[in-house]
Amino acid sequence: MFRYHVKFIEPAMIYKILANEKMQIIWVLNSYFEFYLLFCPRFLMLTLFLIGATYFCFLIWRKKVSRNK
């Protein structure tokens, strides 16, 4: 029943909500991501891959630790 009432939150809406207090932080983050997407798409992919690989290794390590106990 509830799933039909859920609306997708757009990034612009989040920006509007947060803009009242933290305009400076959002501006810095936005310019940072724009720089990333314009100049370093390969670097962005590499960063995302490294984060994902690290998280995957962490999950495997946690399973091994829980088995040993």
UniProtKB/Swiss-Prot annotation:
Keyword list (alphabetical) reads: Membrane, Transmembrane, Transmembrane helix
Q: Name one GO cellular component term.
A: membrane
Main location (coarse class): membrane
Topological category with respect to the lipid bilayer: Single-pass membrane protein
Query: Where's it found, cell-wise?
Result: Membrane
Q: Where are the transmembrane segments?
A: 39-61
State the protein's name.
Putative uncharacterized protein YOR329W-A
